[in-house]
Curated annotation (Swiss-Prot):
Keyword annotations of the record: Cell inner membrane, Cell membrane, Membrane, NAD, Quinone, Translocase, Transmembrane, Transmembrane helix, Ubiquinone
Signal peptide: none
Predominant localisation class: membrane
Organism lineage string: Bacteria, Pseudomonadati, Pseudomonadota, Alphaproteobacteria, Rhodobacterales
Documented EC number(s): 7.1.1.-
Organism of provenance: Cereibacter sphaeroides (strain ATCC 17029 / ATH 2.4.9)
Name of the protein in its database record: NADH-quinone oxidoreductase subunit H 2
Gene Ontology BP terms: aerobic respiration
Amino acid sequence: MSVLLIALFSLILLLALLGAAGVFTWGERRLLGFLQERLGPNRVGPFGFLQWVADTLKLLTKEDAPPAGADLAAYRLAPALAAFPMLAGFGVVAFAPRLVISDLDVGVLFVMGMLALTVWALVLGAWGSRNRYAMLGGLRAAAQMLAYESFLGLSLMGCVLLAGSFRMGDIVAAQEGGLWFILLQPLGAALFFLAGLAAAHRLPFDLQESEQDLVAGFMTEYSGMSFALFFLGEYLAILLVAALFTTLFLGGWAGPILPGPVWFGLKVAAISVVFVWLRAALPRPRYDQLISFAWKVALPLALLNLLVTAWIAVGRAA
């Protein structure tokens, strides 16, 4: 792909992702309203569809006033660090054969690295705010990411072993014409989904911004577009986790009749709907229960799944 085509595709992808994140906020609020038997946004545009545009314009016009005594460098850097790595992560996602900005040999590891950077944004924002509630939220985020990133990587290694590659396109190609890896790796898929919820900081793994005891957690002192960038990063993280889950376990772009990018988009949308459904259905656990589950239950299961898969892969190769 020439440099001009890469630049053009990158621009189109950027605009599509920003639009998808905005539409997702509207879809989430409408779906939550339906699940909770109440009205969602229904004033701006048909079915409230333009509510996300109105919210964006409102945040653009709001003042962004740092608190007194804030570390301005950390305070300003944190929102950008929450959003931009998520955009970079989509640079290695293969939406269809040859429809990828950069099909890296270590594409899966690159996406994991981008997801892990979000915890730096949360800790920097908490530290820069000089706020006790924000600092507690940042510390929770750091401990949670350390616990859940450990088995996030282990849970996807089964797919890497079966495909024999970290490249996104190779993993999808290994599932074409055969069984999707969600059927061969059901435990790995379940563990990866749970870890993905934690990586995206979604309920029930959103204790770093728990409103009941931390006001707004690490975002307590943010407003205006800085606040919006944190939310943009969160929704892009959901889409990135859904895209990675689709690639690893749902065959990527594979599907009958419809074009590959359409199948990929439908699968990502379905996974994103499950994220919203879980937000409406599940309570928030205690912090000690959350961390204990990661270290005592999920991590041993991920190791067991990896060992069994490695044994099967070696047996097939022999």
